[in-house]
């Protein structure tokens, strides 16, 4: 059962990472297309340079967001496995005391 939970968590992490990569790719493509549009309408070399810099900034931001999402997904996978260890049960219904010793 434990390995099944780990496999499910890994699959979920992989799917989330694929989605993050796809989103970043779309953002980078949109940035490139926007740059081309701005360069076509710009007459001044300075405006063309500003369009290129804006594209680069958007591409870096998309890459940063992708990496942040991957780190978040890895952390989420780790927290999924935390609650799967051994549990202690209480017979006194008092939190913090195992098997009824002390407390009441």
Swiss-Prot record:
Residues 75-89 have a biased composition (Polar residues). Induction: By abscisic acid (ABA), osmotic stress and heat shock. Maximally expressed in dry seeds. Also present in mid-maturation embryos. Residues 1-24 have a biased composition (Low complexity). Signal peptide: none annotated. Residues 1-104 are annotated as: Disordered. It comes from the Eukaryota. One of its GO terms (biological process) is embryo development ending in seed dormancy. PANTHER family: LATE EMBRYOGENESIS ABUNDANT PROTEIN 46, LATE EMBRYOGENESIS ABUNDANT PROTEIN 6-RELATED. LEA proteins are late embryonic proteins abundant in higher plant seed embryos. They may play an essential role in seed survival and in controlling water exchanges during seed desiccation and imbibition. This is 11 kDa late embryogenesis abundant protein. It comes from Helianthus annuus.
